[in-house]
Amino acid sequence: MEDLLDLDEELRYSLATSRAKMGRRAQQESAQAENHLNGKNSSLTLTGETSSAKLPRCRQGGWAGDSVKASKFRRKASEEIEDFRLRPQSLNGSDYGGDIPIIPDLEEVQEEDFVLQVAAPPSIQIKRVMTYRDLDNDLMKYSAIQTLDGEIDLKLLTKVLAPEHEVREDDVGWDWDHLFTEVSSEVLTEWDPLQTEKEDPAGQARHT
């Protein structure tokens, strides 16, 4: 109804403005068109009033209205739950108050030079190995070592063992010339008796 009234007003305004530009005949035609529109509007208003009078009034209140409201509320609640499920969830499980993780660019990431990094050595407890001198001292001092496995007596062996100064040789630096002369002299001393023994039987045979 309101749209029709607005159209009627616009047409009247356009006709009123166009009357100044038209002649007498045109004004008569416009007046007839205006009367025709007024008749249509009056018929529409009458039909609208009769139709509104014929419609029964809605009944308000009662248990039926409450059930309709409850069904509408449930439908809205189910729609909200579905909308919440369809939303993209964040990593923390909540869309509100969560920080968006930022992926750094490859240019910002500093390449680590693993060549210059040296791994720390493992810490291993190494047992100290006893030297021969320590073993000799323990063998001479402690009588507990004189028995092996608690059954074998090693006293006879310890009595026959030679002292260290007789077994150990002095570390002397070798000179090639000096070593060659010593070896050659020893070889010659060994060869001289053999040569004399070989020569003596021949001489004895001649004398006989």
Swiss-Prot record:
GO terms for cellular component: centriolar satellite; centriole; ciliary basal body; ciliary tip; cilium; cytoplasm; intercellular bridge; intraciliary transport particle A. Expressed in the retina, predominantly in the photoreceptor outer segment. Signal peptide: none annotated. The keyword Nucleotide-binding does not apply. Residues 18-65 are annotated as: Disordered. Residues 28-53 have a biased composition (Polar residues). The modification N-acetylmethionine is found at M1. Pfam families: IFT43. InterPro entries: IFT43. Its main location: cytoplasm. The modification Phosphoserine is found at S78. GO terms for biological process: cilium assembly; intraciliary retrograde transport. Belongs to the IFT43 family. As a component of IFT complex A (IFT-A), a complex required for retrograde ciliary transport and entry into cilia of G protein-coupled receptors (GPCRs), it is involved in ciliogenesis. Involved in retrograde ciliary transport along microtubules from the ciliary tip to the base. It is linked to Cranioectodermal dysplasia 3: A disorder primarily characterized by craniofacial, skeletal and ectodermal abnormalities. Clinical features include craniosynostosis, narrow rib cage, short limbs, brachydactyly, hypoplastic and widely spaced teeth, sparse hair, skin laxity and abnormal nails. Nephronophthisis leading to progressive renal failure, hepatic fibrosis, heart defects, and retinitis pigmentosa have also been described. Retinitis pigmentosa 81: A form of retinitis pigmentosa, a retinal dystrophy belonging to the group of pigmentary retinopathies. Retinitis pigmentosa is characterized by retinal pigment deposits visible on fundus examination and primary loss of rod photoreceptor cells followed by secondary loss of cone photoreceptors. Patients typically have night vision blindness and loss of midperipheral visual field. As their condition progresses, they lose their far peripheral visual field and eventually central vision as well. RP81 inheritance is autosomal recessive. Component of the IFT complex A (IFT-A) complex. IFT-A complex is divided into a core subcomplex composed of IFT122:IFT140:WDR19 which is associated with TULP3 and a peripheral subcomplex composed of IFT43:WDR35:TTC21B. Interacts directy with IFT122, WDR35 and TTC21B. This is Intraflagellar transport protein 43 homolog. The gene is IFT43.
